[in-house]
């Protein structure tokens, strides 16, 4: 209880600080947020599950985003963002106060550099090509069902995004994973990632690489063996106006000693997955998402899965939208994939069971 009260006091203090800053320095600090709640009904293995969920299409969150003009085209920037569960009022993820993003940096003609808890180039590419109207990389997107979370966000990191030149820009991230944590290998979770984005008119393409140190053992010590997994990601899209189409393809290699299960925090078996998806706009004044994707486990085809979805997004206003859809996961005998929320797990399934899920929800931005 004391820990919760301390977090509430910190949150209240930060909101008061943001309000004071807004009054004294115009709009250099912005308080923002999103609340998303939905009803899901899932059918799997002869069982029906009905539940109220948070963060299905858009992760429920609040945050502070700020900047200070330092002169000469240079600005100090920061972002603090906390995820929460709208259906229960609890803090999401690992329970940290700012579990989504927490960084400070500098922005200038060179681009932007950030130090703290940052997104990787892979995650930015997932967002760019796993399409959606109310939000991207969300309920219904195949990539959202298959992505390995530790490759998306990394603490103790430095992130650099260059200024665009000729339609191209570069993203770089370096992170110390365990960062000296007692009882873990010193290099566990160390991450190095680079990506390039190119935009020309209505066409966009990304290519990314990420390597991450993992352990092959579930019980960790400072002397546990550590190896390096390597991820290769490619994405592309084209926007015709009424229709936008996109595709993602990712390979994971060099997962020494990892065959069918995640054995430690950063361990992930060799696999490939892809998603092809499209947005069709102006359908009954809303937008339809169509998504299909497949996951292939390199060591054993019994771990394969396929994902199918259709979702309808409708804006009630600039800040409020509603959505509804149906999605299906077809698991091979050893796979346990579900239709995941934008933040948080989907309805659980047993190994080899298929899942069909219906959803209806509302999202509001402030």
Describe every region a protein language model picked out.
Residues 1-25:
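Gram-negative bacterial Sec-dependent N-terminal signal peptides
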Residues 26-42, 49-177, 188, 196-204:
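Outer membrane beta-barrel
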Residues 30-32, 75-77, 112-116, 169-171, ...:
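Residue-level detector of the transmembrane beta-barrel scaffold of outer-membrane proteins
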Residues 39-47, 84-90, 121-123, 178-182, ...:
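Gram-negative outer-membrane beta-barrel proteins
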Residues 187, 193-314, 326-328:
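Detector for outer-membrane/organellar transmembrane beta-barrel domains
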Residues 316, 350-366:
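Outer-membrane beta-barrel "beta-signal"
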